[in-house]
């Protein structure tokens, strides 16, 4: 997934419009080291004992003699498990910002207490990972090959030899599916999810989904565009591969949808526009990528952006292309969009 391997697609581009953009097209050559799968964590609810088995979304079944406690996970997965009482100690992926604060993808975790094996793309300390003696590695996957997200292509084989891996697919499915998978993973690791905080969070998610459904039905004329900003390119996401957009669309949200021919260069994930052409698609609401590697709306200086009707109307809301897959963290994604649609003025 290096810049060289991505040819004309930049790394920023690959990350821009849905987490993995053209992993199908861009990373097909990467393949995947079909590493064994497994996932788990040590936790506040760690009363489980005995053998541990988990079948991941690659169809790979991981079997360990005991429930793992030395878990290493992609930071977003670790943050979701944390919400269920499973305290992952080792992470990789965007964990800390340049000033040392928690990245948006770290959720509620105390990042000062985490062992970080790599904080940016293509960075993963194999030596540090080996010394940690992991029992399992858990990540998401953005393609049909099961490529482990944020596990570098150059070192994936070495990493795979040190511990089995578990992959949670976030490719071409609705948000509810990976939510259910992480729930099952947490439960297998000893989390008590049948009552209390977790059960309540699930109910609140379901209520938020119903609110969004009603808002979309009441305001079918409101057009929503999902965007992501880089210095030279504005990415317009399609809805057919991203877990959040697929789900919102299923709930009835009226999205801007670039034609497949326009999304081809982006592996089917997005269309790239120059800032001069950022007004190509009329939109009443713009959802903007909230990840730290993208330019945030307040920092966009392009005049063409500032002239957009949705921007002038203050109808720009955040979007999390790589949502933390716990019900508690995904509920606000639904309520924020529902509220935006309910209050939106028809400006496009």
Language-model segments: which ranges?
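Bacterial Sec-exported substrate-binding components of ABC uptake systems
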Residues: 1-79, 193-227, 290-296, 340-348
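Short helix-initiation/N-cap motifs at beta->coil->alpha
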Residues: 57-58, 117-125, 265-274
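A short, structured surface patch at a secondary-structure boundary
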Residues: 74-128, 132, 141-148
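Proline-aspartate-enriched helix->loop->beta-strand connector
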Residues: 133-139, 283
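Extracytoplasmic substrate-binding proteins
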Residues: 157-230, 323, 327-348
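Structured C-terminal subdomain patch of bacterial secreted/periplasmic proteins
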Residues: 161, 177-178, 274-348
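Ligand-binding pocket segment of bilobal, Venus flytrap-like solute-binding proteins
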Residues: 208-220, 229-236, 267-291
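Alpha-helical, coiled-coil/dimerization segments enriched in small aliphatic residues
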Residues: 238-269
